Amino acid sequence: MAKKDVVVMQGYIIEALPNANFKVKLDNGHEILAHISGRMRKNFIKILPGDRVTVEVSVYDLNKGRIVKREKVNKD
């Protein structure tokens, strides 16, 4: 069931912080603080600086978000 009061945005990881928090730079230039979603934590998805991610940002607090997906990396 999707939440209605979130905005889905793309960005990349700038910095890994303690407690599974990350600093994310969005494609529109804003920097936010984001944490890993429970499903990613449960499945041991590793996120490193430089990874492309999909972030859900609440419309009530545009400085915090939840990382819901790590984009696949093309190995060229």
Swiss-Prot record:
Recorded GO MF terms: ribosome binding; rRNA binding; translation initiation factor activity
Query: What disulfide bonds does the UniProt entry report for this chain?
Result: none
Q: What function does the entry list?
A: One of the essential components for the initiation of protein synthesis. Stabilizes the binding of IF-2 and IF-3 on the 30S subunit to which N-formylmethionyl-tRNA(fMet) subsequently binds. Helps modulate mRNA selection, yielding the 30S pre-initiation complex (PIC). Upon addition of the 50S ribosomal subunit IF-1, IF-2 and IF-3 are released leaving the mature 70S translation initiation complex.
Q: Where in the cell is it found?
A: Cytoplasm
GO CC terms, sorted:
cytosol
- S1-like domain: which residues? 1-72
Identify the InterPro entries for this entry: NA-bd_OB-fold, RNA-binding_domain_S1_IF1, S1_domain, TIF_IF1
This protein's assembly is summarised as: Component of the 30S ribosomal translation pre-initiation complex which assembles on the 30S ribosome in the order IF-2 and IF-3, IF-1 and N-formylmethionyl-tRNA(fMet); mRNA recruitment can occur at any time during PIC assembly.
Family under the similarity heading: Belongs to the IF-1 family.
Q: Which Pfam families does the protein's record reference?
A: eIF-1a (PF01176)
* Keywords assigned by UniProt, alphabetized: Cytoplasm, Initiation factor, Protein biosynthesis, RNA-binding, rRNA-binding
- Spell out the NCBIfam families in the cross-references: infA
Q: What is this protein called?
A: Translation initiation factor IF-1
